[in-house]
Each structure stands twice: as C-alpha cells, then as structure tokens.
Regions:
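P-loop NTP-binding/switch modules centered on Walker-like glycine-rich loops
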Residues: 3-7, 11-92
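Short catalytic/signature loops enriched in Gly
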Residues: 64-153
Length: 153
C-alpha cells in the first residue's frame, strides 16, 4: 500500500502529469493499492477507483469515483465539485462554499456541514446523520436522504 498525501500540490502541470504517470505505472506494475489524500478533484478523476469525501473528520460520501463525481449525493460533495473552476465558465464568478469550516475542537451537535449547507433543515443541526446506502450504490451521511435511502449501515 502506498499512501500519497497531496502528491501533486504546488507542482506545475508537467511535474503533476509525471507524478500521476508514475503512480499509475507503479499501481499496475506492482499491483499496488494507493490511498490518495488530496483536494484536487482532477487527480481523483485521473487515479481513483473509489473515493471517500470527508468533512470535519467524518465520511460524508463514499463510492465509486465515477459515480460520486458525476452524481454526488451529499451537499458538501456537490458544493466541492461546483467550486472547481472550469474554462467553460470563463468570465463568471467562481462558486464558493459560504461560511467557514467548523472549529474541530468544538464541533457542533449535529452535522458539521449544516451551517454552510444550502439545503439544511432543523434536524441537521440537532443530530449527526447516519451513513446510508443510496440507490446509486454510494454511501451518504445526510438527513435529507435518509427517508429515500435504505436503512443505516
């Protein structure tokens, strides 16, 4: 197992591409599992088979990378994907997630994303949601989907 923590952060595009090719090659050559820790969704798209999206130390969504990136279920995953700049939106304002991340030493009683979530309901700030299996096969931690999703895992 290779743990790669932000392997391309701060590198120019050519060096990033070289690192990604090296990781792919070693994955294939050695039948190596890679745990990739990154905020770069382009790197996730290039390398990951499965993805876990975390916020404030908790898993918010987990599933096949293609599924999570093309059909995100959790409001944080959706916001994270929307915050990635695209050339097709040139000249438009960049999307930003409102508010500030929580203080990890003083986490709220409920969902730690609820203060920043555009679709939060009162239950979100009151209790931490369970992780549920969605119809897409992803696991999602969100009260808004609990009634439409099978029982908690």
């Amino acid at each position: 197992i290779l743990i790669a923590d932000e392997p391309t952060t701060g590198l120019d595009v050519l060096v990033q591409a070289t690192i990604l090719l090296l990781l792919k090659r070693e994955h294939t050559r050695r039948n190596l599992s890679i745990i990739l820790i990154t905020h770069d969704l382009g790197v996730v798209r290039a390398l990951a088979t499965r993805v876990i999206v975390m916020y404030a130390g908790k898993i918010q969504e987990e599933g096949l990378a293609d599924t999570v990136l093309s059909n995100p279920q959790h409001p944080y995953t959706k916001a994270l994907i929307n915050a990635v700049p695209h050339s097709r939106h040139s000249g438009q304002r960049l999307y930003q997630i409102k508010g500030q991340p929580p203080d990890l030493l003083k986490l709220p009683a409920g969902c730690s994303f609820s203060d920043r979530c555009q679709v939060a309901v009162s239950m979100c700030s009151a209790s931490i949601p369970d992780l549920h299996l969605s119809p897409s096969g992803s696991k999602v931690r969100c009260h808004l989907f609990s009634s439409d999703i099978t029982s908690p895992l």
